[in-house]
């Protein structure tokens, strides 16, 4: 675009020059054409008259008119040429001003772009924006960019120098790693024996692996005698045993707890001094109390029945529930009697009563209400054979006098009429019995 503007500008300049040359050539040609046929007027007599005659001739008049017209044309051509030149000059000046403004703006944009690349401060950017010429912009740009490049090189050099200073040879790096590992192992060994921090600091300040080994040997040689302690792990995910050497139980416990912690075992600790054994049992997971079933207690039932004797147990949440279960059990086994309960031993006792009323028909015992489901019970414990024999012997001994009494009663008792509870019959029977007794006594006295 800029090149095209320059070409147009030079074409206009060339046209202006060509127009000026053409006008000058035209004026020169006209003057030559007018002057060429006229020669010097010879001096003759009566020249005034002759001149007057020639001046008024048609040829002379025509020539004069042509000369006047040519002069007018020349003047007009010159005026047009001058006006065109002035206009061209004004346009060229305006174009040059616009081109200069464009060049100035482009130079500023290029300079600011380069300043941003090097991180130049706003102070220098303002100087560029206030510059009036392209040459001034380029000069300032060159100076600022050169300074920025030098600053960058200096920073990079300093950074590289620091980096190189921080680097160590590969051999030194390997030695440093070996030294660090030796220190870690040495400190672990010292922890087993409960060595003080003073000796650990000596290890940490050692400069070579050999120095660490010498220190650890000296320290261990000076330590008191150690014992072997054992750890039993009862964890959810880790179970097993391990041992360690330590000067006392406290030191061993510290080592074992660290070991358990490293392996994610957290539980209750116990120690047996006789076997020098620690045991850690991991705690069970905590369960929400609302999810737990009620606690149950074991209750016992002692049965003293006519046909069933023994004991049984059941588990229940309270004594009332156990009592219902026991009564249902007794009822199912035909046991009905007097119930007692001992809270201290959680024991129920049912004793079946032996009641015989003469003349009364045996009646079935009333069954208690079974309002709850049966609770499984432990079957009643049978009575041992030896105990049973003893009981049978006692029963036989007890039955002998009872049999005599029963015989006496049978002899004295009248036949039943179905009204065993009639008071009148009872009184009559007693009177008869008394009379019979009196007669027997009297007859006996007479015999004596």
Swiss-Prot record:
Residues 384-412 have a biased composition (Basic and acidic residues). PROSITE patterns: GRAM_POS_ANCHORING. Its main location: secreted. Residues 358-422 are annotated as: Disordered. Sequence repeats lie at residues 104-140, 179-215, 228-282, 298-352. A motif (LPXTG sorting signal) lies at residues 414-418. SUPFAM superfamilies: Bacterial immunoglobulin/albumin-binding domains, Immunoglobulin-binding domains. Coiled coil: none annotated. It is found in: Secreted, Cell wall. Residues 104-215 are annotated as: 2 X 37 AA repeats. InterPro entries: GA-like, Ig/albumin-bd_sf, IgG-bd_B, LPXTG_anchor, M_anchor, YSIRK_signal_dom. Residues 386-410 are annotated as: 5 X 5 AA repeats of [DE]-D-A-K-K. Pfam families: GA-like, Gram_pos_anchor, IgG_binding_B. Residues 1-33 form the signal peptide. It is a peptidoglycan-anchor. GO terms for cellular component: extracellular region. The modification Pentaglycyl murein peptidoglycan amidated threonine is found at residue 417. Keywords: Cell wall, IgG-binding protein, Peptidoglycan-anchor, Repeat, Secreted, Signal. Residues 228-352 are annotated as: 2 X 55 AA repeats. GO terms for molecular function: IgG binding. The keyword Ubl conjugation does not apply. Residues 418-448 form a propeptide. The keyword Aminoacyl-tRNA synthetase does not apply. Binds to the constant Fc region of IgG with high affinity. This is Immunoglobulin G-binding protein G. The lineage of its organism: Bacteria, Bacillati, Bacillota, Bacilli, Lactobacillales.
């Amino acid at each position: 675009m800029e090149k095209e503007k320059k070409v147009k500008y030079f074409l206009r300049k060339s046209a202006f020059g060509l127009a000026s040359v053409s006008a000058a050539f035209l004026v020169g040609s006209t003057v030559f054409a007018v002057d060429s046929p006229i020669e010097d007027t010879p001096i003759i007599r009566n020249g005034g008259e002759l001149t007057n005659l020639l001046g008024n001739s048609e040829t002379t008049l025509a020539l004069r008119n042509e000369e006047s017209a040519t002069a007018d044309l020349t003047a007009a051509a010159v005026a047009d040429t001058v006006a065109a030149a002035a206009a061209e000059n004004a346009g060229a000046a305006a174009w040059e001003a616009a081109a200069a403004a464009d060049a100035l703006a482009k130079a500023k944009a290029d300079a600011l772009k380069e300043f941003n690349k090097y991180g130049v401060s706003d102070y220098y950017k303002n100087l560029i924006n206030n510059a009036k010429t392209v040459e001034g912009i380029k000069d300032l740009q060159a100076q600022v960019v050169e300074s920025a490049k030098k600053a960058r090189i200096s920073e990079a050099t300093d950074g590289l120098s620091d980096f190189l200073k921080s680097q160590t040879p590969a051999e030194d790096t390997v030695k440093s790693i070996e030294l660090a590992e030796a220190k870690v192992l040495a400190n672990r060994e010292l922890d087993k024996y409960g060595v003080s921090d003073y000796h650990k600091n000596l290890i940490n300040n050692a400069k070579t692996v050999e120095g660490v080994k010498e220190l650890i040997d000296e320290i261990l040689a000076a330590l008191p005698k150690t014992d072997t302690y054992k750890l039993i792990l009862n964890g959810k995910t880790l179970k097993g045993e391990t041992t360690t050497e330590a000067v006392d139980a406290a030191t061993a416990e510290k080592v074992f707890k660290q070991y358990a912690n490293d392996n994610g075992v957290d539980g209750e600790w116990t120690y047996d001094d006789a076997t020098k054994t620690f045991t850690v049992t991991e705690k069970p997971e905590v369960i929400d109390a609302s999810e737990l079933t009620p606690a149950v207690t074991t209750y016992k039932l002692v049965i003293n029945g006519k046909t069933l004797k023994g004991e049984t147990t059941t588990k229940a949440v309270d004594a009332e529930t156990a009592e219902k279960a026991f009564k249902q059990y007794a009822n199912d086994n035909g046991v009905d009697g007097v119930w007692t309960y001992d809270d201290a031993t959680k024991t129920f006792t049912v004793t079946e009563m032996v009641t015989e009323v003469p003349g009364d028909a045996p009646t079935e015992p009333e069954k208690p209400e079974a309002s709850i489901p049966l609770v499984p019970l432990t079957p009643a414990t049978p009575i041992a054979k030896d105990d049973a024999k003893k009981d049978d012997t006692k029963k036989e001994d007890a039955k002998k006098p009872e049999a005599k009494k029963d015989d006496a009663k049978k002899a004295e008792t009248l036949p039943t009429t179905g009204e065993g509870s009639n008071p009148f019959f009872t009184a009559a029977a007693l009177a008869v019995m008394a009379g019979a007794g009196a007669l027997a006594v009297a007859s006996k006295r007479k015999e004596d």
